[in-house]
Amino acid sequence: MTMLLPGQSGIDESGNIPWTTEFCAQIKATGVKNIYLELGAVFGHSVVTHAEVCGHLLGQLIDAVGSDHVIWGTDSIWWGSPQWQIEAFRRFQIPEPLQEKFGYKPISTRDRELILGLNSARLFDIDVQAAHKAIPGDAMNQMKMAYQAAGEEPSMTQYGWIAAV
């Protein structure tokens, strides 16, 4: 994504996003079904700084391949805890003016479930129901229960580079 100043979207009247719009159009035109698109740092950055761009990106990606072919990624190795991105995705909705003008569909609860994990589970042939039943007492579940008992206060800490002085 090009560096955009506040108040700029980099999107023309037709909704064109350089590279993304053309790529999505090619996918739709060819009917290719073996492509999965990943939401990573571009979602995190755009949802915070350029919500209109984020709305167009999600609208175009989901329109091109369907919510069943979009997977969640966070680039957390570079940015620390992904919780802030997950919370943003759970709350974000494509703005209604974009839905009306460009025909983007609202992001449904089912879309979010697919994107946040069910699509990846399907790709890796993981039976989600069986996996939930198989690990009720594992260390991760015990940490989750302790976290819930402590009041479920998520960390929104971001990590990054620090300039040497």
Range-by-range predicted roles:
Residues 1-72, 80, 97-108, 146-164:
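Catalytic pocket-lining loop regions of alpha/beta-barrel enzymes
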Residues 66-134:
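His/Asp/Glu-enriched, well-ordered alpha-helical/loop segment
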Residues 120-165:
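Active-site microenvironment of metallo-dependent hydrolases
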